[in-house]
């Protein structure tokens, strides 16, 4: 049972409260039984599950609860709070300092995905604007340097290693010295792993640690071993000063929940989780947003961060066009490019309230990305006049031979080009409405700048554009309005970043 299954089962248990006519002790116990069964199936320690049940029962006294209170809401809140506590070690994680050398040393057993995770972390910080690099001090595993070199080259990250030097301490020290002199901000050192916790592994880790004096030692943990993670993490913490943990392979193993709760029990903060084999299948781990996404409640904060990463406010030309209600096919193409930059599509969908981690299966995700690429391929066959026309759809309707030319050039049927133009027309209509709303692009809190009735009209326009199935998963019109309110308050001025995204 992967994490998506765990989320679905807990959500189903909580939903049973909504179906119950009267909320009494029997209904509460039945719901808790389902939640606990799901957690045990995910390999969460039985003592932790028992504690969660007792804490919820202690927090909810149905007999003493005032009649005016929403019992369902109170119970759901109590369960949510206890699930957060289950994966929260209660320890603040180390964070790097911008503008100075931050040395991060990776440790872990062989096969945990340590080398790949080094590259993922370097790439993550590189995308955030940090100067990052990689050092391969793994001289034990054949091909370790080749793997790191390949990953680093693909992501355009500077790296250091040696095919001739066999002493990992020398390689690590030389690499750190080199990159410090070049003012790199994130210096990641990959060390040797073993098949088991050998004394020689710990001795080597200590030597490398003493040589490079890391600011943070990260232990990489394989989620597939479940609650056995606790013993492993403690063994490493006893030998070296492990400050953070990254849990890998959470995308396809039944024991992910057990692994996360076990690590939290060691009081080691989990800083990231690996959710796939690709370099951007990597997410910062924050307890509340994680549980929120798991239960299909979304992560607006994470979505805002993704949109802010695109630095859309810097694109003054686009903002000026949006203010005047103008939107060309080239603008739509650029918005599709922005969606591609935001990371794995399933990861983004999971941040929207109403979409659990199981809504977007790998097959659906690939299908959506393929569709997006197909639309971009069609636009690649258009000329400048077509892409930059203020009403591109009208130009094509007046001269249908253009549709045939674009279809031939992109290798698609004419109906595919027509579908793209229909999509574009919907976007252009919404932008026209946005351009007529005063205060939308003013900056600051949009909820204060924008007339509520105008905002409601815009929400209705967006609802018309959306697939009915998508709108249903968001909780209908009320769910869409709630999400937009959160987005307005948290990402003032960045609403145009949602362009194109809402209809995918």
Curated annotation (Swiss-Prot):
InterPro entries: AAA+_ATPase, P-loop_NTPase, Signal_recog_part_SRP54_M_sf, Signal_recog_particl_SRP54_hlx, Signal_recog_particle_SRP54_M, SRP54, SRP54_euk, SRP54_GTPase_dom
Pfam family, one: SRP54_N
UniProt keyword Hydrolase, yes or no: yes
Catalytically driven reaction(s): GTP + H2O = GDP + phosphate + H(+)
Region (G-domain): 1-295
Family: Belongs to the GTP-binding SRP family. SRP54 subfamily.
Domain free text: The NG domain, also named G domain, is a special guanosine triphosphatase (GTPase) domain, which binds GTP and forms a guanosine 5'-triphosphate (GTP)-dependent complex with a homologous NG domain in the SRP receptor subunit srpra. The two NG domains undergo cooperative rearrangements upon their assembly, which culminate in the reciprocal activation of the GTPase activity of one another. SRP receptor compaction upon binding with cargo-loaded SRP and GTPase rearrangement drive SRP-mediated cotranslational protein translocation into the ER.
Subunit and partners: Component of a signal recognition particle (SRP) complex that consists of a 7SL RNA molecule of 300 nucleotides and six protein subunits: srp72, srp68, srp54, srp19, srp14 and srp9.
NCBIfam families found in the cross-reference section: SRP54_euk
The protein, known as: Signal recognition particle subunit SRP54
Gene source species: Danio rerio
Chain's gene name: srp54
């Amino acid at each position: 049972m992967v994490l998506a299954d765990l989320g679905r089962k807990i959500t189903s248990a909580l939903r049973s409260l909504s179906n119950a006519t009267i909320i009494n002790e029997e209904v509460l116990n039945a719901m808790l039984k389902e939640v606990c069964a799901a957690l045990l199936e995910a390999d969460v320690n039985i003592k932790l599950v028992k504690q969660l049940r007792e804490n919820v029962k202690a927090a909810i006294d149905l007999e003493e609860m005032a009649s005016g209170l929403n019992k369902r809401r109170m119970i759901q809140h109590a369960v949510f709070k206890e699930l957060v506590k289950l994966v929260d070690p209660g320890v603040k994680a180390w964070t790097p300092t911008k503008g100075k050398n931050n040395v991060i040393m990776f440790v872990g057993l062989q096969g945990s995905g340590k080398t790949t995770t080094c590259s993922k972390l370097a790439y993550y910080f590189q995308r955030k604007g940090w100067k990052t690099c990689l050092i391969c001090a793994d001289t034990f595993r054949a091909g370790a340097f080749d793997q790191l070199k390949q990953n680093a080259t693909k992501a355009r990250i500077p790296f250091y290693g040696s095919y001739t030097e066999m002493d990992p301490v020398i390689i690590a020290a030389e690499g750190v010295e080199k990159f410090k002199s070049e003012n790199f901000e994130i210096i990641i050192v990959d060390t040797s792993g073993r098949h088991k916790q050998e004394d020689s592994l710990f001795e080597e880790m200590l030597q490398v640690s003493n040589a490079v004096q890391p600011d943070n030692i990260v232990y990489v943990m394989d989620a597939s071993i479940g609650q056995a993670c606790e013993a492993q993490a403690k063994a490493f913490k006893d030998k070296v000063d492990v400050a953070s943990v990254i849990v890998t392979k959470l995308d396809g193993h039944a024991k992910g929940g057990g692994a996360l709760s076990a690590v939290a029990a060691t009081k080691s903060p989990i800083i990231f989780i690996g959710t796939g084999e690709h370099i951007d299948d990597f997410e910062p781990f924050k307890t509340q947003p994680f549980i929120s996404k798991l239960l299909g409640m979304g992560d607006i904060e994470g979505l805002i961060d993704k949109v802010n990463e695109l630095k859309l406010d810097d694109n003054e030309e686009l903002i000026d066009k949006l203010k005047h209600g103008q939107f060309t096919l080239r603008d739509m193409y650029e918005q599709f490019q922005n969606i591609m930059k935001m990371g794995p599509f399933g990861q983004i969908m999971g941040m929207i309230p109403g979409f659990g981690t199981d809504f977007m299966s790998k097959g659906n995700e690939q299908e959506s990305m393929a569709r997006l690429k197909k639309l971009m391929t069609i636009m690649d066959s258009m000329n400048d006049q077509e892409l930059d026309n203020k009403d591109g759809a009208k130009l094509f309707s007046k001269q249908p031979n253009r549709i045939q030319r674009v279809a031939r050039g992109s290798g698609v049927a004419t109906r595919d080009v027509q579908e793209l133009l229909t999509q574009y027309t919907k976007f252009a209509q919404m932008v026209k409405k946005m351009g007529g709303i005063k205060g939308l692009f003013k900056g600051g809190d949009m909820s204060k700048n924008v007339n509520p009735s105008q905002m409601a009209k815009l929400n209705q326009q967006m609802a018309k554009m959306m697939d009915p199935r998508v709108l249903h998963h968001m909780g209908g019109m009320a769910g869409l309005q709630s999400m937009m309110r959160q987005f307005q308050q948290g990402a003032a001025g960045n609403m145009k970043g949602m362009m194109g995204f809402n209809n995918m």
